[in-house]
A protein has these predicted regions:
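AMP-forming adenylation/ATP pyrophosphatase catalytic core
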Residues: 24, 140, 231, 248-252
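Immediate flanking context of iron-sulfur cluster ligation sites
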Residues: 203-224
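Iron-sulfur (Fe-S) cluster-binding segments and ferredoxin-like electron-carrier domains
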Residues: 219-222, 227-249
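ATP-dependent adenylation/nucleotidyltransferase module used to activate substrates
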Residues: 3-204
Length: 252
């Protein structure tokens, strides 16, 4: 079975992956407002795909990212942008991103196999919503900014998980059993953060319009100490001598 993500190998002369070999497509894209999902949005827009974006308010402490998602959706003129509320996910707790009693780890990048910022079954839920929306819109492509290099401990960012969900889409939907082939695209799955930064630049993405911090201040200013901030800064520092892009000023 072909993999659910369709990565085109990049070279210095061709930094932007070519579109998979089919005609113009309709896709549902998971848009958080962070660097990875924004880069995916810029990429599929470059490909000429018709984009329906989904964002989620699940009680995350970094809810300010949703404002960035709205701005990105407007800038890239997506066909539609839906904000889905999943209050129960936040109510369940169990993650530093949704449970105020669990502190977001600082300066702890790579110290645990599965960090406490993992939100139980989050991508499973997000992809299920995306699949439902895709079926109503006649879309066959679902795009997610999952990355298995920077967050190798997240079980719902692994290739095996995405392959399995593609099978779920085929077996568990009317469109699937009638022969529609849904495909999960994770174009950044095996790309380093520096590689993502380079791709974002090649696509002309305004990276300062994205928010990556897990524990931001009320105005979106980053803590610069959580895993996500450290990965972002590392990516910019490694990308052709690039420097950190705001909003990454330290909170006061």
């Amino acid at each position: 079975m072909s993999p659910p993500f369709h990565l085109q190998r990049k070279s210095p002369s061709t930094p932007v992956p070519a579109a998979p070999a089919r005609g113009k497509r309709i896709c549902v894209l998971l848009l958080s407002g962070g660097l990875d999902s924004a880069t995916c949005l810029a990429l599929v827009t470059r490909w000429g795909w018709n984009v329906h974006a989904l964002s989620f308010d699940y009680g995350q402490r970094h809810r300010v990212e949703l404002a960035a998602a709205r701005r990105l959706a407007k800038k890239y003129r997506v066909a539609s942008h839906r904000l889905i509320a999943i209050p129960s996910l936040g109510a369940f707790g169990g993650s530093a991103l949704t449970d105020p009693s669990i502190r977001v780890p600082k300066k702890a990048l790579g110290k645990t196999r599965i960090p406490v910022t993992y939100v139980p079954a989050r991508n499973t839920l997000f992809l299920a919503y995306a699949l439902s929306f895709a079926e109503t819109r006649g879309a066959t492509e679902i795009v997610i900014g999952a990355n298995a290099l920077d967050y190798s401990g997240y079980p719902d960012c692994r290739p095996a998980f995405l392959r399995a969900f593609e099978k779920v889409a085929r077996l568990g939907t009317k469109a699937g059993v009638e022969g529609t082939a849904f495909r999960i695209h994770a174009p950044l799955l095996k790309t380093s953060k520096a590689g993502i930064v380079r791709l974002a630049r090649a696509l002309g993405l305004d990276t300062s319009a994205t928010i990556s911090c897990y524990d931001p201040g009320p105005a979106g200013q980053a803590c610069r100490e959580c895993d996500s901030c450290l990965l972002r800064e590392k990516g910019f520092s490694e990308a052709d001598g690039g420097k950190v892009i705001l909003p990454l000023r330290r909170r006061t």
